[in-house]
Amino acid sequence: MVKEIPQIAAQLYCVQDYLGTVKEFEFALDQLHQIGYRAVQYANRGVLAGDNPELSLVRAREAFERKGLVCSSAHRPWSALRDNTDIEIERLQTLGCSYVFLNFLEQPYDMHEADSYRRFSIDSVPVIQALEDAGLQIGFHNHSHEFQRNGPDGETLFEFMVECFDERFLFEPDVYWISNGAIDPAEVLARLKGRIPCVHVKDAEVIPVEGDGA
C-alpha cells in the first residue's frame, strides 16, 4: 500500500522533461500520485509554459483534480506580477494556489546588490496588497547568492531582505541552496519563524574533489 504524503508537494519544475505533451503531463501526474504525493507546485514548463499554454490552466486544474492532486503554490516572474497583476491573480486563482513565489530579482534590479533589494521592498508593496486583497500571498525562493555578505553592514543579502521587506512578504527557504551558501538551514528556518508557508527540500550529492591547496 502506498503511503500518502498529504503535506508534501512535488515541484513540477523537477519533472519538466516529462511535461512536453498533454499525454506526458497526465502520465507524470499519475506517477506522482502513485508515489504518494497529493499536491504539486506549478512551474511554467512544458505544456504549461507561456501566456497561452498548450494546456489551459482550467484544464490543468481539472487534470490535477482527476489525479487527486491540488496545486499548493506557483513560481512566477516578478515582471508578470508587476505588469499584469490582475491577470496573474486570475491565473493563481484558476490553479487554486494560495501562494506565489519569486525565484530571483530580475532586471532592472541587480540580484547581487543590497540597494536593489531595498528598492524592490518599496516597489513590491502595491502587488503585495493586491494579492492580499485577492486572498493570496507572495514570497521569495532563495538560491545561494543571497547569502553573499553584500549587505550595507556586512550582513548577508538574505538577512537584509528579511529586515527590509514588508512583513507580509513571505519566504520559501530552499535548504539545498542555503547549505550551498555555507549557511546552516536550521538557523535560517528559525530566523524566519512565522513567515514560512513552504520549504524546498532536495537531494545533494557529495562529490569528492581533489583540490589544489588548503
Predicted regions: what they are:
Residues M1-Y99:
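N-terminal pre-domain/capping segments
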Residues Q16-K23, Y42-S56, R76-T85, Q107-H112, ...:
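Acidic-and-aromatic substrate-binding clefts and catalytic sites of carbohydrate-active enzymes
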Residues G68-R76, C97-Q107, V125-D133, R168-P173:
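Short, basic, helix/turn surface patches
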Residues A10, A39-V40, L131-A214:
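Acidic/histidine-rich catalytic cores of soluble enzymes
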